[in-house]
């Protein structure tokens, strides 16, 4: 399934935007290589985990090597994290706008490829 959704909310403006699109996952290609070269060492350190995010563990831990401690990895060490790195490219196809108001909400949908918009029941 290549669908992707983004949801944004502004408490101040009382507006929610939900965008729907198609995602392409890039792994070990020119796009990821170019993006990886722009990352900082503190960001690369996050990709050095030996387990996947959300895996169950027995105790609270960061899953980073104990010898890493609070230090940043060397350039050579950081390259080991590239295998866990990807770029998610997304093309937004449509989005919905929702305005929350005590006198009645308002909702609209915009379909970008068709240059169409319509009102929806909130």
Describe each model-derived feature in a short phrase.
Residues 1-14, 22:
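A short mixed-secondary-structure module that forms the rim of ligand-binding clefts
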Residues 15-122:
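Charged, gly/pro-rich active-site loop segments
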């Amino acid at each position: 399934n290549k669908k992707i959704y983004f949801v944004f909310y502004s408490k101040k403006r009382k507006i929610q935007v939900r965008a729907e699109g198609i995602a392409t996952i890039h792994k070990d290609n020119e796009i990821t290589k170019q993006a990886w070269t722009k990352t900082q060492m503190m960001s690369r350190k996050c990709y050095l985990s030996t387990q996947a995010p959300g895996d169950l563990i027995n105790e609270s831990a960061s899953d980073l090597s104990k010898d890493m401690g609070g230090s940043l990895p060397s350039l050579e060490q950081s390259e080991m994290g590239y295998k866990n790195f990807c770029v998610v490219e997304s093309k937004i196809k449509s989005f919905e706008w929702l305005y929350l108001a005590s006198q009645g909400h308002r909702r609209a949908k915009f379909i970008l490829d068709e240059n169409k918009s319509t009102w929806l029941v909130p």
